[in-house]
Amino acid sequence: MEFLKTELPKYGKIYKKEVLDENTNKVVEFYKESPFPNYKSDDDKSTILEKGNKNYLTHEFKKFAGFKKNILEVGCGTGQFSIYFAIGTNNNIVGLDPTIYSLDLAASFAEKNNINNVEFINADIFDDVLKDEFFDFL
């Protein structure tokens, strides 16, 4: 993808770089057991949109960002904010997180709900995988 510095293998909606940092992997193990925030069994586009609209900061940011923007969410976890920012826009949203288990939930939700303008990167925040000055908002 055009936001990556180097090519990474892609599995569905997730680009993957092996996370090697010992401290980061401790965090990964924690969130493996307790993904946050998790999805409810009845969550869909409308429930995520409702949750996002109730959050003042996310709602105002989505309005401020407008359209045709490249937006990066660092530490996206299960991707609920990334997905919220993608719903109803033509923005390109990228969520980055070291926890593959959380990203699997995010990618699965996006695919199940036909949200095509969001992708995810499984990498450490300190990995140099993103192009400089590509994103309009972080």
Where are the predicted features?
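Conserved alpha-helix/loop element of class I SAM-dependent methyltransferases that forms part
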Residues: 43-68
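Conserved SAM-binding motif I beta-strand of class I
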Residues: 92-97
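N-terminal auxiliary segments of SAM/dcSAM-dependent transferases
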Residues: 1-37
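A short acidic, Gly/Pro-enriched loop at the edge of an enzyme's catalytic core
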Residues: 129-138
